[in-house]
Amino acid sequence: MQIAWLNDQQPLLSVFVADGAGSVSQGGEGAMLAVNEAMAYMSQKVQGGELGLNDVLATNMVLTIRQRLFAEAEAKELAVRDFACTFLGLISSPDGTLIMQIGDGGVVVDLGHGLQLPLTPMAGEYANMTHFITDEDAVSRLETFTSTGRAHKVAAFTDGIQRLALNMLDNSPHVPFF
Protein backbone atom coordinates (compact mmCIF):
# COMPACT_ATOMS: atom_id res chain seq x y z
CA MET A 1 0.00 0.00 0.00
CA GLN A 2 1.24 3.45 -0.83
CA ILE A 3 -0.25 6.83 -0.07
CA ALA A 4 0.92 9.73 -2.20
CA TRP A 5 -0.18 13.29 -2.75
CA LEU A 6 -1.20 14.54 -6.15
CA ASN A 7 0.00 17.92 -7.42
CA ASP A 8 -3.20 19.53 -6.11
CA GLN A 9 -2.46 18.09 -2.63
CA GLN A 10 -5.23 15.51 -2.93
CA PRO A 11 -4.44 12.08 -1.42
CA LEU A 12 -3.92 9.08 -3.68
CA LEU A 13 -4.16 5.53 -2.35
CA SER A 14 -2.49 2.71 -4.30
CA VAL A 15 -2.91 -0.91 -3.20
CA PHE A 16 -1.37 -3.80 -5.14
CA VAL A 17 -1.42 -7.52 -4.36
CA ALA A 18 0.19 -10.36 -6.29
CA ASP A 19 0.31 -14.06 -5.50
CA GLY A 20 2.95 -16.29 -7.05
CA ALA A 21 1.80 -19.50 -8.65
CA GLY A 22 2.63 -22.36 -6.32
CA SER A 23 3.48 -24.65 -9.22
CA VAL A 24 6.43 -22.58 -10.50
CA SER A 25 9.93 -22.03 -9.15
CA GLN A 26 9.96 -18.22 -9.04
CA GLY A 27 6.30 -17.41 -8.32
CA GLY A 28 7.05 -15.58 -5.09
CA GLU A 29 9.74 -13.50 -6.76
CA GLY A 30 7.39 -12.79 -9.66
CA ALA A 31 4.75 -11.52 -7.23
CA MET A 32 7.27 -9.30 -5.45
CA LEU A 33 8.55 -7.89 -8.75
CA ALA A 34 4.98 -7.26 -9.95
CA VAL A 35 4.02 -5.26 -6.85
CA ASN A 36 7.30 -3.32 -6.81
CA GLU A 37 6.98 -2.48 -10.50
CA ALA A 38 3.37 -1.35 -10.01
CA MET A 39 4.44 0.97 -7.18
CA ALA A 40 7.32 2.37 -9.24
CA TYR A 41 4.97 2.91 -12.18
CA MET A 42 2.51 4.81 -9.98
CA SER A 43 5.27 6.95 -8.47
CA GLN A 44 6.40 7.89 -11.97
CA LYS A 45 2.85 8.77 -13.03
CA VAL A 46 2.22 10.88 -9.92
CA GLN A 47 5.51 12.76 -10.32
CA GLY A 48 4.76 13.36 -13.99
CA GLY A 49 1.30 14.67 -13.13
CA GLU A 50 -0.26 12.41 -15.77
CA LEU A 51 -2.78 10.31 -13.92
CA GLY A 52 -6.05 9.16 -15.42
CA LEU A 53 -7.86 6.45 -13.47
CA ASN A 54 -8.99 4.45 -16.48
CA ASP A 55 -8.42 1.31 -18.57
CA VAL A 56 -5.42 2.89 -20.31
CA LEU A 57 -3.59 3.30 -16.99
CA ALA A 58 -4.39 -0.30 -16.01
CA THR A 59 -3.30 -1.70 -19.38
CA ASN A 60 -0.06 0.29 -19.43
CA MET A 61 0.73 -0.77 -15.87
CA VAL A 62 0.21 -4.44 -16.76
CA LEU A 63 2.40 -4.05 -19.86
CA THR A 64 5.14 -2.45 -17.73
CA ILE A 65 4.95 -5.24 -15.15
CA ARG A 66 5.13 -7.85 -17.90
CA GLN A 67 8.23 -6.18 -19.37
CA ARG A 68 9.90 -6.38 -15.96
CA LEU A 69 8.99 -10.05 -15.51
CA PHE A 70 10.16 -10.94 -19.02
CA ALA A 71 13.46 -9.10 -18.43
CA GLU A 72 14.01 -10.94 -15.14
CA ALA A 73 13.27 -14.29 -16.77
CA GLU A 74 15.72 -13.55 -19.56
CA ALA A 75 18.42 -12.40 -17.13
CA LYS A 76 18.07 -15.64 -15.15
CA GLU A 77 17.74 -17.77 -18.29
CA LEU A 78 14.33 -19.03 -17.20
CA ALA A 79 10.94 -19.12 -18.84
CA VAL A 80 8.69 -16.19 -17.95
CA ARG A 81 6.14 -18.80 -16.83
CA ASP A 82 8.50 -19.48 -13.90
CA PHE A 83 7.52 -16.02 -12.57
CA ALA A 84 3.76 -16.54 -12.93
CA CYS A 85 1.59 -14.60 -10.49
CA THR A 86 -1.84 -13.09 -10.16
CA PHE A 87 -2.13 -9.31 -9.93
CA LEU A 88 -4.76 -7.08 -8.32
CA GLY A 89 -4.72 -3.36 -7.80
CA LEU A 90 -6.74 -0.41 -6.57
CA ILE A 91 -5.95 3.26 -7.10
CA SER A 92 -8.25 5.80 -5.49
CA SER A 93 -8.37 9.57 -5.17
CA PRO A 94 -11.17 11.99 -4.29
CA ASP A 95 -11.93 12.11 -8.04
CA GLY A 96 -12.38 8.38 -8.61
CA THR A 97 -11.32 4.80 -8.17
CA LEU A 98 -9.79 2.23 -10.50
CA ILE A 99 -9.68 -1.48 -9.69
CA MET A 100 -7.82 -3.98 -11.88
CA GLN A 101 -7.40 -7.72 -11.75
CA ILE A 102 -5.76 -10.67 -13.48
CA GLY A 103 -6.37 -13.95 -11.66
CA ASP A 104 -8.12 -15.04 -8.51
CA GLY A 105 -8.33 -13.20 -5.21
CA GLY A 106 -10.34 -10.02 -4.90
CA VAL A 107 -10.63 -6.37 -4.03
CA VAL A 108 -13.53 -5.49 -1.74
CA VAL A 109 -14.30 -1.79 -1.57
CA ASP A 110 -16.79 0.59 -0.01
CA LEU A 111 -17.41 3.53 -2.31
CA GLY A 112 -19.91 5.04 0.11
CA HIS A 113 -22.73 2.53 -0.39
CA GLY A 114 -21.50 -0.48 1.56
CA LEU A 115 -19.05 -3.24 0.77
CA GLN A 116 -18.94 -4.58 -2.76
CA LEU A 117 -16.79 -6.86 -4.91
CA PRO A 118 -16.76 -5.07 -8.28
CA LEU A 119 -14.72 -7.76 -10.08
CA THR A 120 -15.33 -11.49 -9.74
CA PRO A 121 -12.24 -13.61 -8.99
CA MET A 122 -11.06 -15.30 -12.18
CA ALA A 123 -11.06 -19.05 -12.51
CA GLY A 124 -9.26 -21.16 -15.07
CA GLU A 125 -10.57 -23.97 -17.21
CA TYR A 126 -10.20 -26.50 -14.38
CA ALA A 127 -10.56 -26.43 -10.58
CA ASN A 128 -7.73 -24.63 -8.77
CA MET A 129 -6.63 -22.92 -11.98
CA THR A 130 -6.53 -19.21 -12.65
CA HIS A 131 -4.92 -16.70 -14.99
CA PHE A 132 -1.56 -15.01 -14.52
CA ILE A 133 0.01 -11.72 -15.56
CA THR A 134 2.66 -13.73 -17.42
CA ASP A 135 0.07 -15.51 -19.61
CA GLU A 136 0.15 -14.67 -23.32
CA ASP A 137 -3.40 -13.35 -23.15
CA ALA A 138 -2.98 -11.45 -19.87
CA VAL A 139 -3.75 -8.02 -21.33
CA SER A 140 -6.96 -9.24 -22.95
CA ARG A 141 -7.96 -10.98 -19.71
CA LEU A 142 -7.32 -7.86 -17.61
CA GLU A 143 -10.56 -6.78 -15.95
CA THR A 144 -11.13 -3.25 -14.69
CA PHE A 145 -13.74 -1.33 -12.77
CA THR A 146 -13.91 2.44 -12.51
CA SER A 147 -16.02 4.69 -10.32
CA THR A 148 -16.26 8.42 -9.85
CA GLY A 149 -16.32 7.89 -6.08
CA ARG A 150 -13.35 7.53 -3.77
CA ALA A 151 -12.76 4.36 -1.79
CA HIS A 152 -13.77 4.71 1.87
CA LYS A 153 -12.68 1.18 2.81
CA VAL A 154 -10.49 -1.28 0.91
CA ALA A 155 -9.44 -4.89 1.36
CA ALA A 156 -7.36 -6.73 -1.23
CA PHE A 157 -6.61 -10.42 -0.83
CA THR A 158 -5.32 -13.50 -2.62
CA ASP A 159 -7.03 -16.84 -3.08
CA GLY A 160 -5.59 -17.99 0.26
CA ILE A 161 -8.44 -16.28 2.14
CA GLN A 162 -10.88 -15.86 -0.74
CA ARG A 163 -13.29 -18.51 0.61
CA LEU A 164 -13.33 -16.78 4.01
CA ALA A 165 -13.70 -13.25 2.65
CA LEU A 166 -16.40 -13.95 0.08
CA ASN A 167 -19.78 -15.62 -0.04
CA MET A 168 -18.90 -18.03 -2.84
CA LEU A 169 -22.54 -18.59 -3.84
CA ASP A 170 -22.90 -15.07 -5.21
CA ASN A 171 -19.33 -13.69 -5.05
CA SER A 172 -20.29 -11.02 -2.55
CA PRO A 173 -18.25 -9.83 0.44
CA HIS A 174 -18.80 -11.90 3.59
CA VAL A 175 -19.47 -8.83 5.74
CA PRO A 176 -18.54 -10.39 9.15
CA PHE A 177 -15.04 -11.07 7.76
CA PHE A 178 -14.47 -7.36 7.21
Predicted regions and their residues:
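PP2C/PPM-type serine/threonine phosphatase catalytic domain
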Residues: 1-178
